[in-house]
């Protein structure tokens, strides 16, 4: 596999997508038009009181138009390469940036998505090794420790059980929990996030995704103890969205929208940081996210 070529194609694709999004964005176009009209018009009004001939006035006007275009181009480039943003949502600070959940310092809470059974069997059948929960288990648990973790999850009375003794042809645990249930493990929040279809593929409908995120925010709100919470862009990995073709930009919008309507409050020093994995930040229109501070989705 040509990984370098694949990454290059991803970079170009993300760049072109952002370019088109900015060109089509009505807010940006209105701002650009206001710059072109405001600066030359304001200065032209001022110089109209000066004793200048027509040629000088034309030169000044052209310089001002050129300056306006430079301002617009500089802002366009800045937005095009923007890869992080901090929002104030209902009084809570929410930062969105590229990052690795496993590089977050200890004593900050981190969210890891599991399936609705809280499976811990990393064998590329039940849990794939390259997934975040697969990496989490391999990093922090030996075989003996996993047994202890399984028992702690089983004994947690706060987890809402949906069904017991579920028959699963590919193996795994048999107790199914409510989507959005959160189990606190050290400084990690393990979330029951995805379902399995008959072919053992992680999947989620869009309405289930939104409902799950509402539960996640409310659960985290009772557990974070005024600490910063780092959460990956949930659903951007191997989870299939069976009733819609949504990308990472749409998933991020849903995460922010559910955060807003949940009315969860993270007061200083607590805040939420949404981490974008690998090249996901290239598929996000950060400029558009500012609208959440005004009116949400």
UniProtKB/Swiss-Prot annotation:
One of its GO terms (cellular component) is plasma membrane. The keyword Membrane applies. Disruption phenotype: When this gene is missing the Thoeris system does not confer phage resistance in B.subtilis. It is found in: Cell membrane. Keywords: Antiviral defense, Cell membrane, Membrane, Transmembrane, Transmembrane helix. It holds the Pfam family ThsA_Macro. Coiled coil: none annotated. This is Thoeris protein ThsA. It comes from Bacillus amyloliquefaciens (strain Y2) (Bacillus amyloliquefaciens subsp. plantarum (strain B9601-Y2)).
